[in-house]
Structure formats: C-alpha cells, structure tokens
Regions:
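C-terminal region of N-terminal signal peptides and the immediate post-cleavage residues
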Residues: 20-44
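Exoplasmic/lumenal beta-rich domain surfaces
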Residues: 147-149, 176, 251-321
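Short beta-strand elements
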Residues: 337-348
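Short acidic/polar mixed-charge low-complexity motifs
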Residues: 118, 144-147, 189-190, 270, ...
Length: 348
C-alpha cells in the first residue's frame, strides 16, 4: 500500500470519529461514553401488542420469517471460528446516548459478543493504524481504502504493521467489555456488516416487532379519551430479537429493525399518505444531524437490567381532517423477516 500512514490517519473514518469525539469532549477510548462504547440494548420480555393512543383491541399484526442465508459473503467473522455465526448483541443503527444525554448518535457497527481476552483477527489484508490517544481501537485499511475497525481491543500490533486476513491477530478483547465493536467503512461512509453478502454466515429467523403506536404533542402523550385533534406527532416503538443467545448480563436484549416504514389510509381504504421510510439501516446510517429526526424524545439505549426504548418518529405535526384512519407500520430486518401492524386512528 503506497498511501502514507499520516495520509491514512487523516482520511480514515475511524480517525474522523475519534477526532470528533475529542472536539466534542466525548471520550472514545477504553472508558468512553455510550456514544463510542455502546452499551448493548436491553430487552423487556415479549409483550402483547398494544397501543396507548390507538385502541389495542383493534390493532392487527402479521409476520413472516426467513431462516436461510445462502451466501456468498465478502468476509467472515473477526473471531474464531471464522465461518461460524457468533452472537451479536448490538446492531447497526441502534441509538447510542452518552455524556449525560448530550451525545447522541447511531451505532455505526455491530457488537460481537466474545469472552474477554478472545483473539481478534483482521478480516482483510492491509495496513494497521492505531489512534495514539485511543490505543484500544485498531483499524485495518485495505488497498482499495476499505477500512475495518475493531473497538475495545488490546492491540498486539502497531501502527504501520501489515495485517493478513485471518492470520494476523490484531489484539484481544479488553475486559470488561466482553465484545468487539466491529465496523466497516468505504468512501467515508459506514456500512452495515450484516447487509446481505457482507459478513457471513449470518442466519436470522427472528421477527421484528412493533410494540406500540402513540400520538403525542410536545413530547406529551395524548390519551384516547376522545378523538385526537390535528397537529400531533406519531411515534412507533419497535425492536427486534438477536438470532443467537447473548451471554449474561446482556442476555435477552433487543436490537433495532433494519427498516421501518409507514403509511396512512382512510377507514374506507383510500390511501391518504403513501409508504414512507422512517429509518433504513440495511446498508448505511443517516448523518448524525438526522438523529433527532429519526429517534423521538424518550428513546433510550439499553443498559444491564434497564431496557431501552426505540421510539421512531413517523410524523411530526400531522395535520388531518376529522375522520377515521388506519396507520400501517411495517418493519424488516436485513434477512427479510418482517412484520406489519395496523392501528385505528380517530381525528376529531
């Protein structure tokens, strides 16, 4: 690779993220806030379908599951065995909130669970770069500029070393994290490692979930004691399950669906608002400035014994004529498992 390490340091997405963390006062190192050391998302027990502002007795739901993943894959897993699926406790796009709520961002990789001390391998051949102020984050930059970064890893390599895919141990998982945050970036954009054809094998037969739909105003819940007035926000709380069991204490925790869409139809079936994408993490993530557009107030990430709430903004200040409507919400993961729910909505 002919590019100098100084040039790599200036151009890598990892370098940009760490530089931003330094400028914003958020520590991205081994004792960083949740925005850079993401705590996996906690999961409440399976709930019955409910809707706070939409009558739960009238809500309906449909699901479909896909349990195969034929490949091929661009790369295997960064921990042994390379061609066997490992538990993933944090998904791409999950909300990450740190620095006492002042730092909010989308999770830009996946969290692969493994015991502390587990050897982590390079998933591509390339040059090593380690940020001097954050020595437990290792990047491997390939000849084409593709960057794989590994967070919460005690390095066994140095900046400038040459890494060989699935031969070079770049480090070992640092205690007490019990996972490696694994990220992929190309052309300045983070990509979802769980997209089709990327990391494999990855089989997912779990179905995403629409927990509830609420109508709100100024962050306040509007109760269904009477018909809603126009000019309210619609918020959907969604989640998904991890396909493999996660070790304690991060067991049975939710993750974010890869795709969420919605539409509005009149009670007699006329489409009022067509299908609109709220969040699409299947390939990449929105810019950081879109966080508050995507995630509603009250969204929280998971902590041990403290379930997170993933609240997506469907619409803000929705203006509708008086009448009866149906809100349809659909969620999907990267493997095609999907669910849809219909919620009645009365506007006075």
């Amino acid at each position: 690779m002919t590019t100098s390490l100084a040039h790599i340091a200036g151009r890598t997405v990892l370098g940009a993220v760490l530089a931003l963390a330094l400028l914003s006062g958020v520590d991205s190192g081994t004792r960083a806030t949740a925005s850079s050391v993401p705590a996996p998302l906690a999961h409440a027990p399976k709930r019955e379908q409910q809707a706070t502002t939409i009558d739960p007795q009238l809500a309906s739901r449909s699901t479909a599951r896909v349990a195969t993943d034929p490949g091929p894959y661009e790369y295997g897993w960064p921990v042994k065995p390379f061609l066997a699926q490992h538990p993933v406790r944090g998904f791409f796009g999950d909300p990450r909130i740190g620095n006492h709520g002042r730092s909010r961002q989308f999770h830009f990789g996946i969290d692969i669970s493994a015991p502390n001390g587990t050897a982590v391998y390079a998933t591509q051949t390339g040059r090593i770069w380690i940020h001097p102020l954050h020595p437990t984050t290792v990047a491997v930059v390939g000849r084409d500029g593709t960057e794989f970064s590994y967070w919460h890893v005690v390095p066994t390599v140095r900046t400038g070393d040459h890494a060989v895919a699935y031969e070079t141990v770049i480090g070992r998982i640092e205690a007490p994290y019990g996972h490696v945050h694994f990220a992929e970036a190309r052309n300045g954009r983070y990509l979802n490692p769980l997209r089709r054809g990327a990391l494999g094998p990855f089989v997912d037969d779990t179905t995403p979930w629409i927990a509830r739909l609420t109508a709100e105003s100024g962050g306040r819940l509007l109760l269904q004691s009477s018909a809603l007035r126009s000019g309210f926000d619609l918020v959907a709380e969604v989640d998904d399950e991890t396909p493999l069991a996660i070790p304690r204490p991060w067991h049975d925790l939710p993750v974010t669906p890869a795709l969420t869409r919605w539409r509005l139809v009149a009670a007699h079936g006329r489409v009022v608002l067509g299908w609109t994408t709220v969040a699409d993490f299947r390939e990449t993530i929105p810019s950081a400035s879109d966080y508050d557009r995507v995630w509603a107030p009250g969204t929280t990430q998971n902590h041990v014994r403290s379930p997170g709430h993933f609240r997506l903004v469907l619409a803000r200040g929705l203006e509708l004529r008086a009448g009866e409507y149906v809100v349809e919400v659909a969620v999907r993961d990267t493997r095609g498992n999907h669910a849809a729910s219909r919620f009645p909505l009365a506007v006075g």
